[in-house]
From Swiss-Prot:
This is Bifunctional riboflavin kinase/FMN phosphatase. ATP binds at G248, K254, T260, N262, L315, H317, Y324. Pfam families: Flavokinase, HAD_2. Pathway: Cofactor biosynthesis; FMN biosynthesis; FMN from riboflavin (ATP route): step 1/1. Mg(2+) binds at D17, D19, T260. InterPro entries: HAD-like_sf, HAD-SF_hydro_IA, HAD_2, HAD_sf, PGP-like_dom2, Riboflavin_kinase, Riboflavin_kinase_bac/euk, Riboflavin_kinase_dom_sf. SMART domains: Flavokinase. It catalyses: riboflavin + ATP = FMN + ADP + H(+); FMN + H2O = riboflavin + phosphate.
Length: 379
């Protein structure tokens, strides 16, 4: 995405947020609120997320109680909500790139502080479900250990103090606007990884805004670079989706000259939430036709300004007929780049064909080619 020209000093340590940055807390919170609010005849539709992301638990609870006009006090809400949340804590998944990032920093001896608006006990509980994470953090700071939570700089200043580092030498990684504000107020450099879609315009004060942790380039900040990119692609933990092919927007073949095979988003809503927007690749299987190389986009397609997040796979084969209704199986094995907007249709088409070339070449490599024989593709 973007990087400001204000970068002056390199970094010697990292201060990183937890909820929404390393783990998908928002997904579990949303599920609980959706059920909880029903008993009051209210409906959680996610629009309040922007108001509570990055806030302390008390601030978030106050917002919900007031905005939904709940017939209870904030402490009563919390006494009911937190047992429900604690029972679901083991279901909070790490976000793509999180495990890779913190283990890489640990391996290279980079001091890392976990600095969150959650309480210290809450932080400890959350990371206990992620094996080996606690050992990756030199310091852990919760909002109950300082005078004020984010957007106050207190949490990051305390983290830098415990690491015995000047804040100017620290790199903050944050998903929320309050977190970015806190990092800048503390005098650190800040990378924003927005956790809410289509909200990047709110993060202009950050030194850099990236799409996901998969896109972080540590060498920009004087930190040890990742060495796991292969032929301009990043191997990822494979994930599987499938379903009958349906008709899409009708622009793949007609507008772009690129026939995509669309799947119903209702069948894999969880996968859409878990995986960041961008261009991926892998293998596609049609039981009656075989297995084919595939490149696909996940996201909002900003050029066309989609209203919903979609997955649009392009099977890299010339088919002589449509195959609507046939079962399509996908194994996604690698990542190419973040989602981007384009100034013209021609530049968009050119980039899609460039992605195709990258995917076709990469899928011949043994580390990716081995997935072609996965029985999931044709069963």
């Amino acid at each position: 995405m973007s990087m400001s020209n204000s970068l002056k000093k390199l970094s010697s340590c990292v201060l990183i947020d937890l909820d929404g940055t390393l783990i998908n807390t928002d997904g579990v919170v949303g599920d609980i609120l959706r059920k909880y609010l029903c008993k009051y005849g209210k409906q959680w539709d996610g629009r309040e997320s922007l108001k509570i992301v990055g806030k302390t638990p008390v601030e978030a609870a106050t917002t919900i109680v007031e905005d939904y006009e709940l017939p209870c006090k904030v402490d009563e809400f919390n006494s009911e909500f937190y047992p429900l949340f604690s029972a679901q804590m083991d279901k909070i998944k790490s976000l793509p790139g999180a495990n890779r990032l913190i283990r890489h920093l640990k391996c290279h001896g980079v001091p890392v502080a976990l600095a969150s608006n959650s309480s210290r006990a809450n932080i400890e509980s959350k990371i206990s479900y992620h094996e080996g994470w606690k050992e990756c953090f030199s310091v852990i700071v919760g909002s109950d250990e300082v005078s004020k939570g984010k957007p106050s700089p207190d949490i990051f200043l305390e983290a830098a103090k415990r690491l015995k580092k000047d804040p100017a030498d620290c790199l903050v990684i944050e998903d929320s606007v309050p977190g970015v504000m806190a990092g800048k107020a503390a005098g650190t450099k800040v990378i924003a990884v927005p956790s809410l879609p289509k909200q990047t315009h709110l993060y202009t004060s950050a030194d850099e805004v990236i799409n996901s942790l998969l896109d972080i380039r540590l060498e920009k900040w004087g930190l040890p670079p990742f060495q796991d990119w292969i032929e301009n692609t990043l191997p990822i933990d494979p994930w599987h989706i499938g379903g009958p092919v349906i008709k899409g927007f009708g622009r793949g073949s007609k507008v772009l000259g690129i026939p995509t095979a669309n799947l119903s988003t209702k069948d894999y809503a969880d996968e859409l939430v878990e995986h960041p927007s961008g261009v991926y690749f892998g293998w596609a299987g049609l039981a009656k036709r075989g297995v084919f190389k595939m490149v696909m986009s996940i996201g909002w397609n900003p050029y066309f300004n989609n209203k919903e997040k979609t997955i649009e796979p392009w099977l890299l084969h010339d088919f002589t007929e449509d195959f609507y209704g046939e079962e399509l199986r996908l194994i996604i094995v690698g990542y190419i780049r973040p989602e981007a907007n384009f100034s013209s249709l021609e530049s968009l088409i050119a980039k899609i064909h460039e992605d195709r070339e990258v995917a076709e070449k990469a899928l011949d490599l043994p580390s990716y080619a081995k997935f072609k024989g996965d029985p999931y593709l044709t069963k």
